[in-house]
Amino acid sequence: MEKYDLITILGPTASGKTPLAAALAYKLDTEIISGDSRQVYRRMDLGTGKDLEDYVVNGQQIPYHLIDIVDPGYKYNVFEFQRDFLNAYDQVRWKDKLPILCGGTGMYLESVLKGYRLLPVPENPKLRDSLADKSLAELTRLLSTYRKLHNSTDVDTVKRAIRAIEIEEYYKHQSAEYREFPQIHSLIIGVDIARELRREKISHRLKQRLDEGMVNEVKALLDSGISSEDLIYYGLEYKYLTLYVLGKLSFNEMFHQLEIAIHQFAKRQMTWFRGMERRGFTIHWLDACLPMEDKVEKIINLLHTKN
């Protein structure tokens, strides 16, 4: 009987997650499910770093899921990701294969590893009013009486604690069947890249994608009728390149501000992954600089290692 139902490969931007996932998928004859919140969009290729050529290993196309599934302008969210992930996961498992979930969007990855379905929770003004005068200590005690959906590290302010209670209260009144989400036992691999090397690779990739036509990609999206507000909403490359195309930033301003923003984004990704470890997930970190064959071999050894 298989020890794991899934392999998850995570890491910050420019760490080499996708080539590793593809090399592993080739070795295991399996398929990749993308866990990236922006690669779901069609025609947003250079700006989201799709690098589709990475999915070809030794001349073989590695099947992938959840890339290019919605049109630009749409506001895709984590609730839809859970649904779409399960559909893709079931398709791969149906073939008796071990799927590989690969991405850097921590919220998306954690949403399927946690084991409960996320629901969009509306505000409850009446409940908020009833909690408004309580201290953080009182709210934390109250929160502890619910089925534990939240970790205490997430509720370090009164506002967060009230929202956590609001979510717990909403879930309490949903049927168990509605909340059901399969328990997926995943081997989680983290690609660990030294900060300076990460920064160097981010800067190199940014220059490379600009050379490959990222500005023209943004112009084409705007020309096709996608609003500048929608592109700015997607953040990072699309935000700063749109501001550049609109004449609100010079090229140098755009490049400098975008470079800083991507470095900050990578740092936030690592913060999320370290938070996952505090929340009880075991992440097996591999040095990004190891030869690909060594990384793949280490993962396969972990797959077969007994607890």
UniProtKB/Swiss-Prot annotation:
Cofactor: Mg(2+)
Keyword line: ATP-binding, Magnesium, Nucleotide-binding, Transferase, tRNA processing
Catalysed reactions listed for this entry: adenosine(37) in tRNA + dimethylallyl diphosphate = N(6)-dimethylallyladenosine(37) in tRNA + diphosphate
Any one Gene Ontology BP term: tRNA modification
Chain segments carrying region Interaction with substrate tRNA: 36-39
Site feature location: Interaction with substrate tRNA: 105
SUPFAM superfamilies hit by this protein: P-loop containing nucleoside triphosphate hydrolases
Enzyme Commission number(s) of this protein: 2.5.1.75
tRNA processing listed as a keyword: yes
Disulfide bond residue pairs: none
Gene3D superfamilies noted in UniProt: Crystal structure of tRNA isopentenylpyrophosphate transferase (bh2366) domain, P-loop containing nucleotide triphosphate hydrolases
Residues that, per the record, bind ATP: 11-18
Record: residues binding substrate: 13-18
The keyword tRNA processing is assigned to this record: yes
One Gene Ontology MF term: tRNA dimethylallyltransferase activity
Subunit architecture: Monomer.
The protein's role, per its UniProt record: Catalyzes the transfer of a dimethylallyl group onto the adenine at position 37 in tRNAs that read codons beginning with uridine, leading to the formation of N6-(dimethylallyl)adenosine (i(6)A).
Family under the similarity heading: Belongs to the IPP transferase family.
Entry protein name: tRNA dimethylallyltransferase 2
Organism annotation: Phocaeicola vulgatus (strain ATCC 8482 / DSM 1447 / JCM 5826 / CCUG 4940 / NBRC 14291 / NCTC 11154) (Bacteroides vulgatus)
